[in-house]
Amino acid sequence: MAVTDDLRRRMHHEHRTLRVLQEDLLDRFESFCEERSSERHRDFVGVFEDFRASLQRHFEFEEEGGYMQQVLDRRPHHKTKVDMLQREHREIRVVLDRLESELATDLTEDLPRCDDFKKDFVDLMTRFGRHEQAERELVMEVFWLEGGVSD
C-alpha cells in the first residue's frame, strides 16, 4: 500500500503545527514561571488551549483512518507498538484535561498548586516528546525504511 502525497503532506503539517505550538507553549510557560502574573497566566492558557486542540486533532488523524491504520495494514506485526501509542494518546488526554482544569483557576496566588502544576506540565511535555519520538521512529521504519528497502 503506497503512502499518498496527501497523507505525507498532512503528516508533515500536523507535526510541524504541533512543534510550533509546543515551542510557543514552552516559551509562555517559561515566561509564566519567571513572573507569575495574571497576564502571563492568560497568555499561557491561550496557547495551552491551542496546543491541546491541535493535539486532539492530531491524535484523531492518527487513530481514525489516519496513518496508524496504514501502519497496521502494511505491517501488522507492529500492532503492539500502535496499541501502545494509542494508549498513550488516552493517557496524555487525561493529563491535558486535568491541567486544563487547573489552569481554569488562577495559579498565581497559590504557590504550592503552581509548583505542582509546573512539575506536571514538565512531565507532560517530556512524555509527549518521548511519544512523538516513538511515533516518528515507527513511521520511518514502516513507510520509509521497510517500504523503501524490503518491499
Language model features with spans:
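Small-residue-biased structural context
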Residues: M1-D151
